[in-house]
């Protein structure tokens, strides 16, 4: 199956940075996450990228399917080898979310682009991008972190189950013209490398401080798998801080969803 990605141009677009210099471009694949994990186990370098035009079994967080049609969006996974502790995987997710939000915001001037904790990027409260991070440890050290990213770039039509909750860069731009997916990919990848390096160098607090002003749902009533409360922000370790009738709690793994109600109900 042909695709319109030009691997040589992609490498030129990311020249000057480490991530993306080792690049595997595919027309179709079951999952770039699986491809990148295999590459990591075979010794792929830090910053190796698998980019696909189409995925047949793309996946997101919590085992959900990531719908991955060809010719419209970008789906890629990065092999990262950061010198961090195994417990830091959650913070890598937040650093990447911050990076993707920053890149997305640059393509949709005048629109609200925010991180929906912990791994989605919204434009005007509709999902534009998703992140999945999985780590491989050897002993007590991280051998590799596989970072999967999907960004809705040019898609304008959605399956019924996503209508009203998903959007794309093209849909949110006043011009409405199709965007250059290669440029979008290079931009997102560059921001990702920058923020993961920032986390490794400056620690979790640097990510938390930069991310909090860019979080969606702050001060709103939200639900998660087994609770309801007001989302107040994130803790030093990246956990979601929520206020419930029973007090303030920290959620390390949850899926927050907004509730149309008055947060004062829990005051």
Mark where each language-model region is:
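N-terminal lobe of the biotin/lipoate ligase/transferase fold
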Residues: 1-109, 264-267
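Long, positively charged amphipathic alpha-helical accessory segments at protein N-termini or as interdomain linkers
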Residues: 1-2, 18, 86-113, 123-267
């Amino acid at each position: 199956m042909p695709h319109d990605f030009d691997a040589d141009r992609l490498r030129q677009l990311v020249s000057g940075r480490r991530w993306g210099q080792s690049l595997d471009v595919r027309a179709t694949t079951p999952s770039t996450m699986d491809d990148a994990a295999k590459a990591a186990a075979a010794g792929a370098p830090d910053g190796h990228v698998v980019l696909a035009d189409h995925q047949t079994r793309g996946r997101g967080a919590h085992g959900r399917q990531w719908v991955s049609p060809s010719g419209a969006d970008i789906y890629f996974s990065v092999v990262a080898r950061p010198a961090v502790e195994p417990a830091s995987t959650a913070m890598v997710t937040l650093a990447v979310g911050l990076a993707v939000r920053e890149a997305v915001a640059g393509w949709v001037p005048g629109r609200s682009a925010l991180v929906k904790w912990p791994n989605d990027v919204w434009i005007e409260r509709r999902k534009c991008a998703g992140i999945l991070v999985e780590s491989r440890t050897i002993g007590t050290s991280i051998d590799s972190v596989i970072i999967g990213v999907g960004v809705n770039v040019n898609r304008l039509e959605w399956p019924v189950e996503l209508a009203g909750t998903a959007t794309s860069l093209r849909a949110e731009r006043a011009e409405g013209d199709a965007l250059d997916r290669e440029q979008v990919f290079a931009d997102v990848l560059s921001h990702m490398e920058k923020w993961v390096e920032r986390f490794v160098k400056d620690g979790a607090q640097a990510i938390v401080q930069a991310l909090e002003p860019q979080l969606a749902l702050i001060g709103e009533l939200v639900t998660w798998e087994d609770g309801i409360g007001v989302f107040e922000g994130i803790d030093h370790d990246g956990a979601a801080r929520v206020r419930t009738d029973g007090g303030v709690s920290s959620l390390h793994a949850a899926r927050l969803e907004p509730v149309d109600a008055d947060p004062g109900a829990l005051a």
